[in-house]
Design a protein with these regions (language model features):
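Conserved catalytic-core segment of nucleotide-activated headgroup transferases in glycan assembly
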Residues: 15-33, 171-174, 182-237, 247-251
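A charged, aromatic-enriched C-terminal amphipathic alpha-helix characteristic of glycosyltransferases
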Residues: 22-26, 30, 180, 315, ...
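Short N-terminal targeting/anchoring amphipathic segment
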Residues: 70-89, 100-102
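Membrane-proximal helix-turn-helix segments that form the acceptor-binding/catalytic region
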Residues: 74, 109-110, 122-142
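Active-site proximal beta-strand in glycosyltransferases
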Residues: 79-81, 94-115
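Donor nucleotide-sugar binding/catalytic pocket of nucleotide-sugar-dependent glycosyltransferases
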Residues: 137-176
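Nucleotide-sugar-dependent
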Residues: 200-207, 252-257, 264-283, 292-301
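Conserved acidic donor-binding segment of nucleotide-sugar-dependent glycosyltransferases
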Residues: 305-306, 310-317, 325-331
Length: 367
């Protein structure tokens, strides 16, 4: 059983389907699907209202059974896997936190005090840390996104063989190419695809990201290129003169925005991100899109290893814009970068850690 969300959003309730526009949902679906593909029986614990939504063969994780949270019989499952702090809190609320084999996946790991690079502060950070304390007591395993996240967890709760590294990933098989979705052609297209947060979730990060995107858009405009933002978050301070906001689209539609862009960019919500990676790096590279990433993410080495882009000095927006133009003009070996991603950073590769863990503990009952 995999657990994440307590309630659907208003948009999801209206559409009667999960709006797969963010990587948290995609990760939930993809890891669940890949475990099922290995022969395990995997159910999704979904909000009660979502359990009554009509079947849709085109929805994400359509083949996986969905069980209303209030109806889950936790003791009937060998393993319960939660996603992020929220997933564990939902498990607690619905009476499953006493299960003997919980795997808790964390995105950001917070410390017992506010620290640089972890964009949760004050009361929000204290609440998340309290959840981590309960996770440590209840969970058989904890998985994190990066070595720095594992190091911080160890600093907080001591070293353990039960803290595992499972970074983000990307689909091995992507939808067939579709029509160009951009409003116009002419200037080089520079894409930032991702969540920029809002007042309810990491408002400090939102302020920094919007400021950097406005600066980058202005600098790119002087160089004859246009910056586009695709994704969710508070865009009220985004400068439309320099940045075109494309809105948030379903995951399956996002691929064509990446395919028809010239460069994908990554900016950091500060001088560095302590332990939360940038999943967009994997996605840009999956379709052979050159990447220019501001230094500071734990996984920006992927750009260098792929040989399809640049990692630039943090805070040097003018230098970043210059590298974007260079990336758009250079002849790259895009197919080599795609092969690198397929060999190292797909969801199939990520689920190997869970598969080995399940084999170790349940070998006699494996399919």
């Amino acid at each position: 059983m995999t657990v994440y969300r307590r309630n659907p959003t208003a948009e999801e309730a209206k559409a009667r389907d999960f709006a797969a526009v963010s990587m948290d949902l995609i990760r939930w679906f993809r890891i669940s699907e890949r475990l099922a593909a290995l022969g395990h029986d995997v159910d999704l614990a979904v909000p009660d209202a979502a359990s009554a939504w009509p079947l849709n063969p085109h929805r994400e994780a359509a083949a996986l059974p969905r069980v209303a949270l209030s109806q889950v019989r936790w003791h009937e499952y060998d393993v319960v896997k939660t996603l992020f702090h929220r997933g564990f809190e939902v498990l607690e609320e619905y009476g499953g936190a006493q299960h003997p084999f919980i795997i808790s996946k964390l995105g950001s790991v917070v410390a017992s005090r506010d620290i640089d690079g972890v964009h949760f502060y004050g009361e929000t950070r204290r609440r998340l840390y309290a959840t981590q304390q309960r996770i440590r007591k209840a969970s058989r395993y904890v998985t994190v996104l990066s070595p720095s996240a594992r190091a911080l967890w160890t600093d907080c709760f001591e070293a353990s063989d039960n803290t595992l590294l499972v970074p983000g990933g990307v689909d091995a098989v992507v939808p067939a190419a579709g029509a160009d979705p951009y409003p116009e052609r002419g200037k080089p297209r520079v894409l930032f695809a991702g969540n920029i947060y809002n007042e309810g979730s990491q408002p400090e990060a939102n302020a920094v990201l919007v400021s950097k995107l406005n600066q980058l858009g202005r600098s790119l405009g002087r160089r004859g290129a246009r910056l586009y933002l695709l994704g969710s978050g508070d865009v009220s301070r985004l400068d439309p003169e320099h940045v075109t906001y494309l809105g948030a689209v379903e995951y399956r539609r996002s691929w064509d925005y990446m395919r028809h862009a010239d460069v994908g960019v990554v900016v950091v919500a500060g001088t560095f991100s302590h332990n939360n990676e940038s999943t967009k790096i994997y996605h840009y590279l999956r379709v052979g899109l050159p990447v220019v990433s501001e230094a500071g993410f734990p996984n920006d080495n992927v750009v260098t290893e792929s040989r399809l882009g640049f990692v630039v000095e943090n805070g040097d927006i003018e230098g970043m814009a210059a590298k974007v133009i260079e990336a758009a003009q250079r002849a790259w070996d895009r197919e080599s970068a795609i092969r690198y991603i397929l060999e190292n950073h797909t969801w199939e590769k990520r689920v190997d850690t869970y598969a080995a863990l399940l084999t170790r503990h349940f070998a006699r009952r494996m399919p």
